[in-house]
């Protein structure tokens, strides 16, 4: 991933994240759930069955994305964060890489700007997620 892509993603995420906890996070999750029943089912089976729980999950997702995006310049730290997330998802038996791809693609569409840079960055994140899911 180029430094220009990293800078574009970091800048656009910081703008989006300013209203993530108050508004955009829940909007994103509602859009995500409406777009894919498998994603909805995965979250509902983990307990996100109402707006309060969805908002809680959205806030956690925002924090996780912030950690990923803040570490785009540090491959070791980024891989560590991704591996930790995948380990947690393995304990919940959420191991289908397609679900993570859907979520990341929906995030790219939701953010709306800097899409080529976001696609490059999320491709790297998804690749590392697949590696982490396949490891023991």
From Swiss-Prot:
State whether it acts alone or in a complex, and with which partners, per the record: Homodimer.
Q: Write down the species.
A: Phreagena soyoae
Occurrences of domain Globin (ranges): 1-134
Pfam families, per the entry: Globin
Q: What is this protein called?
A: Globin-2
What InterPro entries has UniProt attached to this entry? Globin (IPR000971), Globin-like_sf (IPR009050), Globin/Proto (IPR012292), Mb-like_M (IPR044399)
Record's signal peptide: none
Native organism taxonomy: Eukaryota, Metazoa, Spiralia, Lophotrochozoa, Mollusca
**The entry's keywords:** Heme, Iron, Metal-binding, Oxygen transport, Transport
Q: Does this entry carry the keyword Transmembrane?
A: no
């Amino acid at each position: 991933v180029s430094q220009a892509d990293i800078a574009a993603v970091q800048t656009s995420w910081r703008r989006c994240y300013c209203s993530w906890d108050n508004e955009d996070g829940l909007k994103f999750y509602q859009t995500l759930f409406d777009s894919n029943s498998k994603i909805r089912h995965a979250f509902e089976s983990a307990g996100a069955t109402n707006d309060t729980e969805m908002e809680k999950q959205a806030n956690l997702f925002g924090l996780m994305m912030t950690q990923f995006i803040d570490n785009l310049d540090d491959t070791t730290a980024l891989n560590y964060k991704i591996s930790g997330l995948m380990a947690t998802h393995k304990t919940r038996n959420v191991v289908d890489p397609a679900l993570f791809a859907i979520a990341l693609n929906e995030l790219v569409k939701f953010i709306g700007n800097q899409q080529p840079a976001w696609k490059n960055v999320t491709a790297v994140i998804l690749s590392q997620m697949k590696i982490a899911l396949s490891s023991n």
